[in-house]
């Protein structure tokens, strides 16, 4: 028997003893005539001294209260953890554990992806349900390059198609400028190349009068200005889009 169960047993015995001393059973009440015939000595021996009875009663009450107070601070026993619940969540990921991103590093799994289906939702998902939904959607929209030895992953199928042309050598976007025979695997590469023929420089520096064919060239130049801020280029791009 554990210590906590033993304390409960002793407290129960004390309370039962107190109730037995306080209550007088009905069948134990003898007629007045028979009580008068009992010798005074036997009555005194049966009931004892009232002072001793009161002392015993107070002692039992004190012990019972102490045991009940100790029982309040009994530590709660935690259930033992099953060894099956300690399995690594990576075992359920399958082939996703060796998938690499464009930077060459393994993709990190968010808490929502590592969470078991039967477990309770995390506080983050309760406070921000959109974050959990976004992470789940991103995990379902992975497009891995099928080329042997590559293993790059893209969020959009169009990006994967453009990347796959690097392996196949396909260039479906030819330049339409007269006497130009260049071809490109991506449409944005063709657009940038076409500006070399037209001389178009639509990206103007917000701090000076210089213009550039490519936005990355503009950003590289604008950072040389001491008063440059990235929001300046965003505003200039928005104004250009509205003008077109």
Swiss-Prot record:
Description of what induces expression: Expression is highly sensitive to glucocorticoids and shows diurnal expression patterns. A strong induction of expression seen during keratinocyte differentiation in a cortisol dependent manner.
Chain intervals for the UniProt region annotation (Disordered): 80-142
Entry GO CC: chromatin; cytosol; nucleoplasm; nucleus; plasma membrane
Gene3D superfamilies found in the cross-reference section: Classic Zinc Finger
Assembly notes: Interacts with ZZEF1.
Protein family according to the UniProt entry: Belongs to the Sp1 C2H2-type zinc-finger protein family.
Protein name from the UniProt record: Krueppel-like factor 9
Annotated source species: Homo sapiens (Human)
Name of the coding gene: KLF9
């Amino acid at each position: 028997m554990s210590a906590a169960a033993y304390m409960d047993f002793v407290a129960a015995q004390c309370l039962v003893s107190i109730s037995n001393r306080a209550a007088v059973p009905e069948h134990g009440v003898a007629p007045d005539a028979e009580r008068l015939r009992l010798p005074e000595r036997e009555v005194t021996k049966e009931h004892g001294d009232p002072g001793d009875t009161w002392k015993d009663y107070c002692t039992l009450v004190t012990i019972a209260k102490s045991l009940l107070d100790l029982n309040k601070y009994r530590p709660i026993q935690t259930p033992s953890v099953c060894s099956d619940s300690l399995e690594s969540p990576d075992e359920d990921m399958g082939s996703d554990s060796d998938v690499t991103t464009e930077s060459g590093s393994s993709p990190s799994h968010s808490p929502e992806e590592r969470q078991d289906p039967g477990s309770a939702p995390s506080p983050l998902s309760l406070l921000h349900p959109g974050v959990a939904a976004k992470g789940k959607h991103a995990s379902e929209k992975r497009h891995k390059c099928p080329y042997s030895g590559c293993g790059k992953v893209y969020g959009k199928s169009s990006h994967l198609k453009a990347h796959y042309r690097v392996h196949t050598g396909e260039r479906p976007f030819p330049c339409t400028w007269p006497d130009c025979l260049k071809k490109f695997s991506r449409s944005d590469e063709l657009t940038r190349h076409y500006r070399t023929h037209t001389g178009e420089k639509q990206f103007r520096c917000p701090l000076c009068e210089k213009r550039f064919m490519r936005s990355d060239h503009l950003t590289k130049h604008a950072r040389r200005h001491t008063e440059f801020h990235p929001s300046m280029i965003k505003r200039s791009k928005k104004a250009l889009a509205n003008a077109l």
